C-alpha cells in the first residue's frame, strides 16, 4: 500500500536488479570464469546491479512528464574499501538519463515522446541468458507506441560516435591508432503485430549516418583508416 501510494501520489518509482553473495574455496579466493558469456550463471563472483529511478515532474489534463535515470555497474566482493575508477572491480555508468512525456503529441494521446540519453525498448530472456538486438543508448530523441496498422511503431534518432581503427599496409586493422567519427543512427521497432493467440511479431531496423569531418574524409581517401 505504501509503495502504491508513493508511486501514484508522489510519482516516484523504483525498479531494478542486483546480485551479491559470498563464496570461498580451500585454495584461495574464488575465481570468476567466462564473465558475460552464455550459461555463465554462478561463475561470476561480483555484485552487478541495474537500478532505475523515475520521478513524475508534470501531470495535468492527460499530459505527463517523467524524469528517468538508470544506473548500471558492479560492486566488488573482495574488500570493503574499494572505490569506483580505482582500476578494481567497481564500475558505474548512467545507461539512461532522459525525460519522457505522454499526451504532448497532437492526435496521439498515448504516444511517448522522449529526449535525452535513452534507447528504444530492449528485450532479453533472463533464465536463458539470451539477449536480442540492442539499440544504442546515447543522447537522442524518440517516439514510442505510435499506432500504425495492426501494430505500433517506435522510432528514434540517436548519437553513436565510433572509433575507426587505422589500416595497416596489408589491409588489417590497427586499433592502437583510432579516428573518432561522429555518427547518428535511426532506429525503429514495429511491434505487437498480432499473429495468433498469445503470439505477435516484431520488426527491427537501423540506419547509420556518418557525419564526417574533413580529416575523416582525408584519412578515408588516403586508405589510412
Identify what each model region corresponds to.
Residues 1-108, 113, 146:
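Beta-barrel outer-membrane channel/assembly domains of diderm bacteria
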Residues 3, 38-42, 80-90, 126-132, ...:
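Outer-membrane beta-barrel domain signature
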Residues 92-95, 133-137:
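Extracellular beta-strand-rich solenoid/capping regions of secreted or surface-exposed proteins
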Residues 132-133, 140-225:
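Signature for the C-terminal beta-barrel architecture of outer-membrane proteins
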